[in-house]
C-alpha cells in the first residue's frame, strides 16, 4: 500500500475520483491528517464507514513506526523509526530553551532524514558507515514530521490551533538530500502546502555535501 503521507491534494483527489468521490473529500482527509492529526482512519468521523474501509485497504496511514525515543541531558530527542521493510532511520528534535518559558515551550528544530544510509562517505558522519541502502519515499520523509507532531502535541497541543508542533526544519539527517531530489521536493511541497502542514519555506534549511542534481 502507498503511504497517505506521500499524497498531494491533486494526486489524492484523482485517486478518490476513480472511486466516484467528490473533489472536496481529498481536502477533508488531508485536514484530518495534518491539521487535526488523528491517529487512525476511524478518527476521520465525517467520512463514511465504506470510504474509511477503502482508505484502509488502499493506503498505509503512516509508513513508519516509532521504535524508541532517546532523550539527552540537553533535552534533545532522537526518534528511531522503523520503516515497513525493516529499515531504520533517525529524526532529531533539537530544543532551544528560552528564558522564562520552559522546555516545553522552547523553540524546536527538527532534523529529518532523506535516505537509509548514505553513499557520500563523509569522514565526520556516521550515516555512511554501512553505505547507502535506499532512498526514502516522499511519504516516509513526511511521516517523520507526523511522529514529531504526535510527540510534541502531547507537550504543547498546537494541533488545537492547527499549527505544526515545531519551529524549523533542517534537512541534514541521514542521507544526501539532493541525491533523492524528486522525493524530497514532493515531501517539501506537502509540508509547505496549505492543505498539508502549511509550514513556511523560509523556515526550512537544506544541507548538502555539494551534490548538484
Where are these regions (language model features)?
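Flexible, acidic/Gly-rich N-terminal and inter-domain linker regions that tether
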Residues: 1-108
Amino acid at each position: 500500500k502507498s503511504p497517505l503521507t506521500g499524497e498531494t491534494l491533486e494526486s489524492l483527489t484523482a485517486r478518490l475520483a476513480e472511486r466516484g468521490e467528490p473533489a472536496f473529500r481529498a481536502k477533508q482527509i488531508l485536514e484530518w491528517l495534518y491539521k487535526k492529526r488523528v491517529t487512525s482512519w476511524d478518527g476521520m468521523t465525517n467520512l463514511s464507514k465504506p470510504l474509511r474501509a477503502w482508505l484502509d485497504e488502499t493506503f498505509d496511514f503512516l509508513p513508519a513506526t516509532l521504535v524508541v525515543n532517546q532523550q539527552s541531558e540537553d533535552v534533545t530527542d532522537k526518534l528511531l523509526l522503523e520503516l515497513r521493510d525493516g529499515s531504520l532511520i533517525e529524526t532529531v528534535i533539537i530544543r532551544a530553551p528560552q528564558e522564562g518559558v520552559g522546555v516545553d515551550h522552547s523553540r524546536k528544530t527538527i532534523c529529518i532524514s532523506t535516505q537509509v544510509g548514505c553513499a557520500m562517505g563523509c569522514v565526520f558522519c556516521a550515516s555512511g558507515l554501512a553505505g547507502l541502502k535506499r532512498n526514502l519515499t516522499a511519504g516516509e520523509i513526511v511521516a517523520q514530521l507526523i511522529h514529531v507532531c504526535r510527540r510534541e502535541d502531547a507537550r504543547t497541543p498546537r494541533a488545537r490551533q492547527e499549527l505544526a508542533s515545531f519551529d524549523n526544519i533542517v534537512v541534514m539527517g541521514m542521507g544526501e538530500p539532493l541525491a533523492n531530489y524528486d522525493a524530497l521536493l514532493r515531501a517539501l511541497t506537502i509540508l509547505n502546502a496549505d492543505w498539508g502542514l502549511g509550514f513556511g519555506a523560509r523556515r526550512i534549511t537544506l544541507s548538502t555535501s555539494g551534490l548538484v542534481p
